[in-house]
UniProtKB/Swiss-Prot annotation:
Role description: Component of the ubiquinol-cytochrome c reductase complex (complex III or cytochrome b-c1 complex) that is part of the mitochondrial respiratory chain. The b-c1 complex mediates electron transfer from ubiquinol to cytochrome c. Contributes to the generation of a proton gradient across the mitochondrial membrane that is then used for ATP synthesis.
An example Gene Ontology biological process: mitochondrial electron transport, ubiquinol to cytochrome c
Ranges that cross the membrane: 33-53, 77-98, 113-133, 178-198, 226-246, 288-308, 320-340, 347-367
UniProt-recorded name of the protein: Cytochrome b
Residues at which heme b b566 binds: 97, 196
Superkingdom as given in the UniProt entry: Eukaryota
Record keyword Protein biosynthesis present: no
One Gene Ontology cellular component annotation held by this UniProt entry: respiratory chain complex III
PANTHER family xref list: CYTOCHROME B
């Protein structure tokens, strides 16, 4: 008799995706981040659901409802901090996952890569609207500053901003709709993630060498299920260390002050995972130019397959490209640091140089370096 997991209509799908899936025999720990992102998403949806049971999306009570969750709800504090720090873990995994894709040339799977970029945008949107919900000072002013950027769009900008706000400023209507968006978006992310997996399983996984691995496949279970479980344990360990020992390490103290439209905080800045994009936005003195640079900094990922000039897929055997990749990582870390600094000398010029370098490496240096490597190998 054939095993039920291979015949049952639903179990067959699960089987082909997580059990009998043929996987390359040499994929490293950099391939763990996909499953970790899945775990992060499930964790965020569950903790978010329990928070939503006690949260009220009204300007008068939002801040105190979050305080109530932390003080009066059973284990409310741990649920709240798991959700807040879970977002940070989500973005750490996302950046590692995207970095892996860039390093090993996974972007040549066009459909998978493009859905991935859409997923990145959706997760960033979810995190942004979620940050507004506690209705602290940084929530309010972050929402005001970022939504205001849309007013840079010619002709329709002002109308668009007021339409999103639901009035003439960030107020009750804005908070209510942001809560609605924050609730629905994770389920859209889950659906997109399934499409992402669907496209991936059409082609099979890439591997560190970038060479087709059809001749050497192993079943996903038990080899990679056990490897994923180790990754999950390390993720949960790191998350719980943050939650239990330094829950506010990555947050902003200003968000413990209730939102006050009459008092602007001295330094308005987003959460750490948006700082690199915020630094690029601030490095251009023109409003529309800054917005375009901000969007381009993420949208540039869609161009990666077009900018790939190397005859090899992966960077594994391309030392010059490897150097450039790690310079790009250092540049992004520099931008992250600059995004959290005040707008004054020398941070302005450092931010501008780092922003120019970011686009220059991706658009100019990487394609040229790949061509040089091809010539050195006489290809």
């Amino acid at each position: 008799m054939t095993n039920i997991r291979k015949t049952h209509p639903l179990m067959k799908i699960v089987n082909n995706a997580f059990i009998d899936l043929p996987a390359p025999s040499n994929i490293s720990s950099w391939w763990n981040f996909g499953s970790l992102l899945g775990i992060c998403l499930i964790l965020q949806i569950l903790t978010g659901l329990f928070l939503a049971m006690h949260y009220t999306s009204d300007t008068m009570t939002a801040f105190s409802s979050v305080t109530h969750i932390c003080r009066d709800v059973n284990y409310g504090w741990i649920i709240r901090y798991m959700h807040a720090n879970g977002a940070s873990m989500f973005f750490i995994c996302l950046f590692m996952h995207v970095g892996r894709g860039l390093y090993y040339g996974s972007y040549t799977f066009l459909e998978t890569w493009n859905i991935g970029v859409i997923l990145l945008f959706t997760v960033m949107a979810t995190a942004f609207v979620g940050y507004v919900l506690p209705w602290g000072q940084m929530s309010f002013w972050g929402a005001t500053v970022i939504t205001n950027l849309l007013s840079a769009i010619p002709y329709i900008g002002t109308n668009l901003v007021e339409w999103i706000w639901g009035g003439f400023s960030v107020d009750k209507a804005t908070l209510t709709r942001f809560f609605a968006f924050h609730f629905i978006l994770p389920f859209i992310i889950a659906a997109l993630a399934m499409v992402h997996l669907l496209f991936l399983h059409e082609t099979g996984s890439n591997n560190p060498t970038g060479i087709p691995s059809d001749a050497d496949k192993i079943p996903f279970h038990p080899y990679y299920t056990i490897k994923d479980i180790l990754g999950i344990l390390l993720l949960v360990l790191f998350l719980m260390l943050l939650v239990l020992f330094a829950p506010d390490l990555l947050g902003d103290p200003d968000n413990y002050t209730p939102a006050n439209p009459l008092n602007t905080p001295p330094h308005i800045k987003p959460e750490w995972y948006f700082l690199f994009a915020y630094a690029i936005l601030r490095s251009i003195p023109n409003k529309l130019g800054g917005v375009l640079a901000l969007v381009s900094s993420i949208l540039i990922l869609i161009l990666m397959p077009l900018l790939h000039t190397s005859k090899q897929r992966s960077m594994m055997f391309r030392p010059f490209s490897q150097c450039l990749f790690w310079i790009l990582v250092a540049d992004l870390l520099t931008l992250t640091w600059i995004g959290g600094q005040p707008v004054e000398y020398p941070f302005i010029i450092i931010g501008q140089l780092a922003s120019v370098l970011y686009f220059f490496i991706i658009l100019v240096l990487m394609p040229i370096t790949s061509t040089i490597e091809n010539n050195l190998l006489k290809w």
